[in-house]
Amino acid sequence: MIPHIYDYVIIGGGIGGACTGAYLSNKGKSVCLLEKEPYLGGCSSTFERKGYRYNLGATTFAGWGKGMIVREFFQSLGVEPKLLPLKSAFVQIKDSINLPHHEDLDTFLQALESNFPHPKNRSFWEEVYKLNHEFYRHNSYIYTKRTLAQFIRSIATFLPIAKLFWPLVLQRGDRYIRTHLPNISPTYYQALQAQLRIVTQTSIKESSALGLVLALGYPFLGNAYAKGGMGALFDALEHKIDTVCKGTLVLHIDRRSDYYIAHTHQGDFLGHNLILNLPLFESGRLFDKGPIRDYFNKFKALDNDQSAFMLYGILKCKKPLEHHYQILLPKPLKNTISDAIFVSFSDANDEKMAPSGHLSMTLSVHTKSSAWMGLEKNAYRTQKAHLVSQLLEIVCDTLGVQKEDFVTYFGATPKTFKRYIGRSQLGGIPMSFTRPFFRNPANDTPFRGLYCVGDTTFAAQGWPGVIAGVRNLSRILDANN
C-alpha cells in the first residue's frame, strides 16, 4: 500500500504552527498538523482544571488595529474571531501610580501627565506612535538564510525600512531615553522598562532604540480580549486546517530524498515538506546524528534560561477590574528576575471562562528555568508555595481584593511548562542591541523542504511577531514553488 504523503507536515500547534497550517490549507495544500497536547495554542492556549478555565499565558491579543498584521492575516483566511476591543491594553500600578495604556494617544498622554509629568512627554510619545505605525506599513521584505547569496539578496529587501529606522537600530535604548526623555524619575524609568521587557525580554540598557520604540508602541496598535479565552482563537484557526492530529507526540524524524517521516506513537506521517513550530535549540534531538541535528544544535546558545512563574486562580468578585494589569514592585521577589508582574482577568461577562460573578486570573513573572529544574522535591514544593503566597498577597493588596474571595488558586513553574508543553524556556529570543534581527534564525534552513516558525525564529514573539514570521515563510515558499 502506497502511504499518503502530505504537501506539508507541521509539528507543533502554537501560534506559528496553527497560523501556518491555516494559511497553507487556505492555499489548497494538503496539510497535517501534529500537536502533542489535546488542544492547540502552546503557551498561548487555554486549559481546563477542575472545571475552571485559564489562559496559559498572561498575554494580550495585540496587532488588531485597522491595517495591522494580525487583523489582515485573520481576514485573509476569512476567520472572524469573537473579540472585545480594548481601549486600554493594560494598566500599570505602583503606590499612587495608576497608568492605563490607552490606544488613543491623547487620552494616554492625559493619563501619563497625571502620573509622570515631563516637558517632553508629548514629543516622545508622538514619535513612538508615529514610528510604530510607519514600521508596520513596510511589509514587502523577505528574509532567508538558505544560502549566503539568498541571505544577501533578502537583506536588500529591508532597505526601505533601513532608510527610515537604521539610526534606531544603531542606538541603544538607554541613550534614546536620555536624549528624548532626560532626567525622568526612577519609577517612570521602571514603568518603561517593565513594558519593554514583556515584549523584547530585555532591559533598556540591552535593547536597541528600535526595539524600545516598538515595545512601547504596541498599545497603540489595537488590542483585544478573546471571548472564551485565547484558546478560542485556535479553535477558529483549527477549522481552517486540512488535518489536525492532537494528542500526537512526535518521537523521531527521518529524512528521505523527497519527503520527511514524522514517527509518532499514533503512527507515521509523511510530508514532502516539514515545518517545525518548536524551540529551535531543542529540535535537533528529533533527528539522527548528522547535518540536520548539528544545524539545530548550534542554536543551543539561544536558550537563555528565561522562563515564567505563573499563578492561576478563580476570583469571586463584583468589583470592576481591568483585563490586564502590570504591577510594579520595589524589587524582584526571590527566585524571580523582574520587578514587575503581569496579571490578566477574564471579562466579567465571559461565562465560558468563569461562572457568573467570577473571574479567571492568569499572572506571570519572569524567572530562570535553572531556579526550578534541579530542585529536590520538598525544596521545590516549599519554594513554589512561598512564591505563590507572595504573589497572591501582592494581587490582593494592590487590587483591593480578598484572599478569601479566591475559590481556587495554584502555581506553575518552568518545570510545569516542560511537562505539559515540552519547553521550559519562554518568551522567544531576546531582541537586544547586540542581536539585531538578521542574526536570528530564518524561517528556512539549508535543507530542502525543512522550515521553522515560532518565537525562536524570525521575526519575534507574540501574535504580531510570529505572524510576521508566518508571512515571511509564505513568501519563501512562494519563491521556491
Residues of each region from the PLM?
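Mid-domain catalytic core of redox enzymes
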Residues: F220, L249-S356
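N-terminal glycine-rich phosphate/pyrophosphate-binding loop and immediately adjacent elements
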Residues: I2-S140
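A glycine-rich dinucleotide-binding beta-alpha-beta segment and adjacent secondary-structure elements
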Residues: T187-V199, V401-A460
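A conserved FAD-binding loop/helix module that cradles the flavin
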Residues: A58, D455-D478
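Short coil-to-beta-strand
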Residues: K205-L210, S356-V365, P446-R448
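General small-molecule cofactor/ligand-binding pocket signal
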Residues: K82-L84, V244-G247, V407, Y451
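Active-site/ligand-binding neighborhood in enzyme catalytic cores
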Residues: H133-T243, G247, R423-F433
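C-terminal segments that line or cap access tunnels to active or ligand-binding sites in enzymes
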Residues: K316-K415
